Amino acid sequence: MSVQRYFIYLAYDGTHYHGWQIQPNGISIQECLMKALATFLRKDTEVIGAGRTDAGVHASLMVAHFDYEGEPLDVDKVAEKLNRLLPQDISVYKVCRVKPDAHARFDATARTYKYYITTVKFPFNRQYRYRIHNPLDFQKMNEAALTLFHYSDFTSFSKLHTDVKTNICKIMHAEWTQEDEYTWVFTIQADRFLRNMVRAIVGTLLEVGRGKLSVDDFRKIIEQQNRCKAGTSAPGNALFLVNVEYPQEIFE
């Protein structure tokens, strides 16, 4: 019997999880998905995600893959069954078959994140927004964001002491836009992201918006390739992974 590979498209509210990756000291999205698959397929099944979201970070679209040996699966039935087995804060959109060597992480050509900030206290979105108390200069923040396109080494925005072999990333989009009277969104797209990178960039851009750093200071922080020079990471609760893109040829 042949081994087939499948992609799972899912969303989750990361509030009560210790991130995507399995952790020894807390429940993770990956663990929940593997348990649900093991129950449905009646055997332990490894799941590989397109990336590793940190504790408290959400995804409106994450992609993961798993392998199955046997008769081809009914993908609609798999999605339906997983949704019954998974907690209320994890949802599967669809399952699709891909080529045997397709990889959720290594074949992704682009990933997009959004970070939400708000200027008002509102009880119903507090776990998905970062509340800002002082005025921000979004024009300056966007000027600083534009400088990201001129660099590829983002060591200054990377979590220290990780197992990552390279800090090189290609940023394709980075911009603050106003969603409504009280909400601003930072959208960033790159071929790959480092651990904690988006939150570190947002935290440093907020320092520009507050007038504590100039656009030139922001540029110098990137050039220094030193995490200690950048701003404090923004909280994870306002960050969403919103898209992962793949070349069409990996799908069957």
UniProtKB/Swiss-Prot annotation:
Where along this sequence does the record place binding of substrate?
A: 113
Kindly list the biological process annotations in GO that this record carries: tRNA pseudouridine synthesis
Q: Which GO terms describe its molecular function?
A: RNA binding; tRNA pseudouridine(38-40) synthase activity
Give the reaction(s) catalysed. Answer: uridine(38/39/40) in tRNA = pseudouridine(38/39/40) in tRNA
Give the matching SUPFAM superfamilies.
Pseudouridine synthase
Signal sequence span is: none
Name the InterPro entries on file.
PsdUridine_synth_cat_dom_sf (IPR020103), PsdUridine_synth_TruA (IPR001406), PsdUridine_synth_TruA_a/b_dom (IPR020097), PsdUridine_synth_TruA_C (IPR020095), TruA/RsuA/RluB/E/F_N (IPR020094)
Q: Which UniProt keywords apply?
A: Isomerase, tRNA processing
Q: What is its EC number?
A: 5.4.99.12
Q: Where is the active site?
A: 54
EC top class named in words: isomerase
Q: Which cysteine pairs are covalently linked by disulfides here?
A: none
By sequence similarity, the record places it as follows: Belongs to the tRNA pseudouridine synthase TruA family.
Assembly: Homodimer.
PANTHER family in the cross-refs: PSEUDOURIDYLATE SYNTHASE, TRNA PSEUDOURIDINE SYNTHASE-LIKE 1
**What job does this protein perform?**
Formation of pseudouridine at positions 38, 39 and 40 in the anticodon stem and loop of transfer RNAs.
NCBIfam families with a match to the protein in the record: hisT_truA (TIGR00071)
Q: What is this protein called?
A: tRNA pseudouridine synthase A
